[in-house]
């Protein structure tokens, strides 16, 4: 029979392997940090869109009246290999700081 240590070790290894994301699930947290560089922070901005009734074109609301929230540093440092979309279902941007207001000119979308 298998010893209890062997079973526990096998279960722990299986859980670890399952926790590592497969390639191709989206850009990782570290990739987003590299795009932002040291001077900007990785942020999650709302990506609701407003349709222009005359032209039918979609205009991102976050450019006009949205808000961007910094992704917490503990998520950025611990989860380097996890796809960034697991933490931000909206638009991932590089921002100079937390943006809430009429025009978020200090945020640049890097992933959507």
UniProtKB/Swiss-Prot annotation:
GO terms for cellular component: extracellular region; fungal-type cell wall. Induction: Highly expressed very early in plant infection concomitant with appressorium formation and also abundant at the time of symptom development. Also expressed during conidiation and in mycelial cultures starved for nitrogen or carbon. The MAP kinase-encoding gene PMK1 and the wide domain regulators of nitrogen source utilization, NPR1 and NUT1, are required for full expression of MPG1 in response to starvation stress. The CPKA gene, encoding the catalytic subunit of protein kinase A, is required for repression of MPG1 during growth in rich nutrient conditions. Keywords: Cell wall, Conidiation, Disulfide bond, Secreted, Signal, Sporulation, Virulence. Transmembrane segments: none annotated. GO terms for molecular function: structural constituent of cell wall. Disulfide bonds join 36-94, 44-88, 45-68, 95-107. Coiled coil: none annotated. Pfam families: Hydrophobin. This is Class I hydrophobin MPG1. It comes from Pyricularia oryzae (strain 70-15 / ATCC MYA-4617 / FGSC 8958) (Rice blast fungus). The gene is MPG1.
């Amino acid at each position: 029979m298998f010893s209890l240590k062997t079973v526990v070790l096998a279960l722990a290894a299986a859980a670890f392997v399952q926790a590592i994301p497969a390639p191709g699930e989206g850009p990782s947290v570290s990739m987003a940090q590299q795009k932002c560089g040291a001077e900007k922070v990785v942020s999650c901005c709302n990506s609701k869109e407003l349709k222009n009734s005359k032209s039918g074109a979609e205009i991102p609301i976050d450019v006009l009246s949205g808000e961007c929230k910094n992704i917490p540093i503990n998520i950025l440092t611990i989860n380097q290999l996890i796809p960034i979309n697991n933490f931000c279902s909206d638009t991932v941007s590089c921002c100079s700081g937390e943006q809430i207001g009429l025009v978020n000119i200090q945020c640049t979308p890097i992933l959507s």
